[in-house]
């Protein structure tokens, strides 16, 4: 029986979401459009199989084929990042980070990560996260120019003396210099852990500095710029750390892995290893650069004055409207972004003074600089007359027409 026949309520909602994804311009920096092949294997019979343990060391029988699947995912992941060991079982980036901490830290150990309000992530020590409750967390941030000051981080690290330094961000527009973080970690005797969830797709294409060999451990998600399924991975070159990480994931924080998702990760990695991937990653950066150039030319302030990667941060500290206002207005015009805090933030995190805008999803649809120039100007038009709902409706219709020239899915399920 088809989903439409059995559960029309869910079928209708899923297809409404398909329509939204086709009609709107997805510019949330952490979102992307995955491949049909990835979704096909996620919807396979692999969802039926329990496989507690690791390839060759399972607690269940009948794992001979899923062993092959997981090993393929591991091997492709290692090839992608140029590392010796990889764990592909984490169900998310947050669980990957939790697994790293559990493997290499003891409760109460000090960690030094990027402040959430400066572009870090909840799992980098934020007090509302388990990473900020189990461990003693300290923070570094960006300067008012929106850039990391590595000398300032060294000064903080000398005072804090952390067991681990966490580098990586969810809203940082410039290249992260892992070699400089390595020098800081060495000077204070700290472990160095990189969370490259946002930039992984650029890293594996050679469009961003690789965290290896500089970092002791690296985590990532497999969606975002990698365009794979939703999930996490952990990598290292240290065999002792690898064993501890494996134990920290299973049986530490997870039971049976999601075999259908691990298979989808393997399929995604095959895409990432293809020559076409480098073309995609270059285009992601080129599109973000075009976006930043146009918005600056239209008189808008960008944190750090531009971008080196896949995203920009627009600052409205000198405007009467907030990030929340901009988020809503652009949504009404058919452009999906998210409100975001900015350096020097004066509003609450529920309102903010900025928005985060990314290029990966629209690049996946096939859009290039010409389309991003159009889109950037439409963003500027909306924000220059933010209360003009008639203009928002007009632009929404225009952008829907543009979006329909770049349809990526013709159905909702695979």
From Swiss-Prot:
Q: What is its EC number?
A: 2.1.2.1
**Site, Plays an important role in substrate specificity: residue positions:** 223
Positions carrying N6-(pyridoxal phosphate)lysine: 224
What does this protein need as cofactor?
pyridoxal 5'-phosphate
The record's GO molecular-function terms, alphabetically, read: glycine hydroxymethyltransferase activity; pyridoxal phosphate binding
Q: Where is it localised?
A: Cytoplasm
Q: Which Gene3D superfamilies did the record assign?
A: Aspartate Aminotransferase, domain 1 (3.90.1150.10), Type I PLP-dependent aspartate aminotransferase-like (Major domain) (3.40.640.10)
User: Domain of life here?
Assistant: Bacteria
UniProt keywords (A-Z) are: Amino-acid biosynthesis, Cytoplasm, One-carbon metabolism, Pyridoxal phosphate, Transferase
Q: Which PROSITE patterns match?
A: SHMT
Q: Where on this chain does (6S)-5,6,7,8-tetrahydrofolate bind?
A: 116, 120-122, 240, 348-350
Its annotated pathway reads: One-carbon metabolism; tetrahydrofolate interconversion; Amino-acid biosynthesis; glycine biosynthesis; glycine from L-serine: step 1/1
Name the catalysed reactions: (6R)-5,10-methylene-5,6,7,8-tetrahydrofolate + glycine + H2O = (6S)-5,6,7,8-tetrahydrofolate + L-serine
Q: Which CDD domains match?
A: SHMT
Instruction: Identify one Gene Ontology CC term for this UniProt entry.
Output: cytosol
Biological process (GO) annotations held by this record are: glycine biosynthetic process from serine; tetrahydrofolate interconversion
Which family is annotated? Answer: Belongs to the SHMT family.
Role description: Catalyzes the reversible interconversion of serine and glycine with tetrahydrofolate (THF) serving as the one-carbon carrier. This reaction serves as the major source of one-carbon groups required for the biosynthesis of purines, thymidylate, methionine, and other important biomolecules. Also exhibits THF-independent aldolase activity toward beta-hydroxyamino acids, producing glycine and aldehydes, via a retro-aldol mechanism.
What interactions and quaternary structure are annotated?
Homodimer.
Q: What is this protein identified as?
A: Serine hydroxymethyltransferase
Query: Native species of this protein?
Result: Campylobacter curvus (strain 525.92)
Question: What gene name is given for the protein in this entry?
Answer: glyA
């Amino acid at each position: 029986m088809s989903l439409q026949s059995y559960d029309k309520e869910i079928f209708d909602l899923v297809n409404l979401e398909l329509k939204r994804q086709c009609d709107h311009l997805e510019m949330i920096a952490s979102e992307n459009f995955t491949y049909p092949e990835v979704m096909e294997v996620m919807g396979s019979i692999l969802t039926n199989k329990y496989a507690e343990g690791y390839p060759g060391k399972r607690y269940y029988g009948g794992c001979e084929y899923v062993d092959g699947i997981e090993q393929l995912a591991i091997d492709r992941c290692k090839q992608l990042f140029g590392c010796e060991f990889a764990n592909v079982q984490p169900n998310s980036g947050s669980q990957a980070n939790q697994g790293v901490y559990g493997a290499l830290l003891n409760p109460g150990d000090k960690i030094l990560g990027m402040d959430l309000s400066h572009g870090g992530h909840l799992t980098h020590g934020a007090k509302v996260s388990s990473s900020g409750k189990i461990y003693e967390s300290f923070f570094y941030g960006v300067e008012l120019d929106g850039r990391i000051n590595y000398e300032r981080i060294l000064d903080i690290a000398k005072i804090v003396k952390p067991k681990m330094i966490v580098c990586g961000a969810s809203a940082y527009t410039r290249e992260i210099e892992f070699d400089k973080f390595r020098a800081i970690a060495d000077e204070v005797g700290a472990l160095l852990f990189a969370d490259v969830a946002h930039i992984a797709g650029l890293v594996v294409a050679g469009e961003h500095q690789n965290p290896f060999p500089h970092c002791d451990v690296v985590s990532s998600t497999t969606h975002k710029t990698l365009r794979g399924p939703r999930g996490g991975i952990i990598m290292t070159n240290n065999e002792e750390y690898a064993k501890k990480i494996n134990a920290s994931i299973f049986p530490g924080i997870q039971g049976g892995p999601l075999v259908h998702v691990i298979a989808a990760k393997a399929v995604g990695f095959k895409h990432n290893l293809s020559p076409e991937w480098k073309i995609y990653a270059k285009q992601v950066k080129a599109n973000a650069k075009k976006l930043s150039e146009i918005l600056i030319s239209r008189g808008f302030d960008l944190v750090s004055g531009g971008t080196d990667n896949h995203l920009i941060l627009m600052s409205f500290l000198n405007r009467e409207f907030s990030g929340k206002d901009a988020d809503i207005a652009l949504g009404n015009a058919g452009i999906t972004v998210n409100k975001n805090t900015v350096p020097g933030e004066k509003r609450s995190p529920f309102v903010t003074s900025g928005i985060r805008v990314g290029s990966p999803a629209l690049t996946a649809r096939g859009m290039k600089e010409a389309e991003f120039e159009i889109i950037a100007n439409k963003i500027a038009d909306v924000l220059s007359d933010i209360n003009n709902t008639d203009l928002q409706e007009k632009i929404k219709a225009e952008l829907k027409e543009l979006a329909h020239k770049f349809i990526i899915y013709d159905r909702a399920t695979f």
